[in-house]
Amino acid sequence: MASLDLPKSPNVFHPEKPSAVGSRNSLAQDCRDQQQEVNQLIEEETNKILHHLNTKLPKEVLERLDVMGGLKEKLYNYFNQNYQNMFNRYMVTAEDEMLKKVRGFIDREEMKVLNRYTPKEIAILLDEVAGADKFNTGEIEKSMVNMYGHLQGHIQRGVNELETHTNSLLRQKVDVGAFVRGENAYAVVKCAFKDNLARPKTVTDVKLSINILDSELVSPIFHYQTTVAYLIKDLISNHYIDAIDKEIDRVKDELIDQGKEEMSDSSIIFEKMKMVSDFTDDDCENPDSKRYELISRELMERISNLRAEIDPETFDQLNVRENIKKIVDLENIRNRGFNTAINSITSILDTSRMGYQYIENFKNARELILREYDDTDISNLPDERYQLRLKYLDNAQLIEERKGYEVMLRSFETEVDHLWDVLRTKYDKSKASRFMAKITDFDDLAKVYKKHIKKHYKDKTGEPVYEDIAKVWDEIAFVKPAETEVERMNRTFVYEKDKMRRKLILMRGKLKGMYDYQYPIERRVMEERLAFLESEFNRFDYLVNPFHLQPGLLLDIDITSIKRKKATLDGMANVLNEFLHGISKGFADAAFASFSRRRSTVRADIGQSFASDGSADQKESSGRVAFMDMVNETPALESSVAAEQVDVRSDVGMKTRKAGAVDAGKGRRGRRSAIREL
């Protein structure tokens, strides 16, 4: 529909008409006494100038000036004729122009509504032809929204790829930062780059593990075996938290309306804790307890120990238990969290041109295994490939995972120590079989000189012999410090792994030193065992330590990529960031959000000050105070300060010359300080 441009207001210039340009009267000043405001402003400015004259001019000059009579009237008239008119006309014009802008905006919005207006005759005609179900643009609008959404997704994905390539070019290498961006870096549990065993010069293997906590998931994930009572209690708990948040918002609004100070983050947390008892309590046996206000104790007892599946022999569609379970199942609370995660990762892989040939979804175990190729034989796979494992772990599973991990580590320690003992026994026997060579290593040499050292050195000084001193260091790893509760609850096993790795290296070196170029059966057997332990230990060390995980979603990815090509690495980087953005809420540090100023900018030396003059207190100041005066000195006033300090040096004498670093204003040191100040 065509629109007509109507005049919004007359563009009139007049000194007295309200709403005119340049007028001293405004429509916005309907309830204000303009003359009283002007008189108050002029009176204040006149008194300021008179007070300034009274303080600056001598008394005889003030007596000659008629301050109380003619001068005040002249000042008053000057302000009244100039300052008042300029200031008042500017304010009036600004207010009127703002009204015109608002009025024009309202008119434009009204024209938009008129353009969409449909005459009554056309609406009746459409109803007679078909009806609203036929002439409905809802589906077309949904299609347009989907089209724009896909377009925006492709644009964003292209921008992410460009950003990833740019970062890799700037780095000139591939590192952990190429995968996960800064806002998601906290979710990384382990990321390791290592050369491929078959082609170490051209191919790299990457291990990446990401842990998304329960509290960070957009849609919570529950195990398939979770009871219906647990799901309902979780819903009730979320309802209580929402109610507490609304109550806190209401309290905030009341404080703002009353003009009081807003609550701090700590105060909000304490208030939330106080409100918990208003919604629930710990009395499980009382049917009238607050915890049973939303759902009665009788219903909770009916659904106790009710899980995802019901025994067909006891199933009845009309029972209360079955209907409550049906309501929960219709909302799909049990499965929607994990299903959303699977849909997200698979759709992102499809749109990112990262296809896959093998997928296995363990629905009841909440685990997804996805591989780019179905074959698992490394010798038949290309150098560009990936596989990922998506699994949800609760606290009970993590406890068992940690137990198994620790048992496996102790088993490795037992096997490595056993091979160490066998190799050491063989080494000692090989030394005993050498009749001609009495000295093979440092221990043999120490035995030869043992009596001589005891007789000539230790007995004279009274010190104990080396063999009588308790040997704490095993010469393999440094002494391990005592464990605290933190180490016992969070086993890293870094010390044990480093010690085993060190033992494997020492055993290989000792085998080479014992046999050189000889390969008897003993050497071959021990080298085979050593190679097996090394390969298995590397596989074990490549896994994620469950002591570092927390209950939530675990994304474990293994990538093999060509070093020069890096196609899979770049593609998986975009997939990971988009996946984390879709299912994780992330976290925001409230301390940093409320911290409005950096500490480095809050310093006493930010407010620069000039060097002080030569007063009596300045004479006895220390050298540190004089140095701070030199630092705070400005080059613009360097000459004037130096001129004033000439008299100070003449009065103080030699003592002031020694302590006053500021006094060297005209020398070379003063010029250097001026350069530093600039």
From Swiss-Prot:
Q: Where in the cell is it found?
A: Cytoplasm
Instruction: Fetch the InterPro entries from UniProt.
Output: Cyto_Filament_Comp (IPR053574)
State what protein this is by name: Cytoplasmic filament protein A
Which segments carry the region annotation Disordered?
Answer: 1-24, 656-678
Give the Basic residues compositional bias ranges.
Answer: 667-678
Annotated organism of origin: Treponema pallidum (strain Nichols)
Task: Name the source's superkingdom.
Answer: Bacteria
Primary location: cytoplasm
**Record bears the keyword DNA-binding:** no
Could you name the Gene Ontology cellular component terms for this entry?
Answer: cytoplasm
State the function annotated in the UniProt record.
Component of the cytoplasmic filaments that run the length of the organism just underneath the cytoplasmic membrane.
Which spans of this chain does the record mark as coiled coil? 24-49, 290-311, 397-417, 522-540
* Keywords for the protein's UniProt record, in alphabetical order: Coiled coil, Cytoplasm
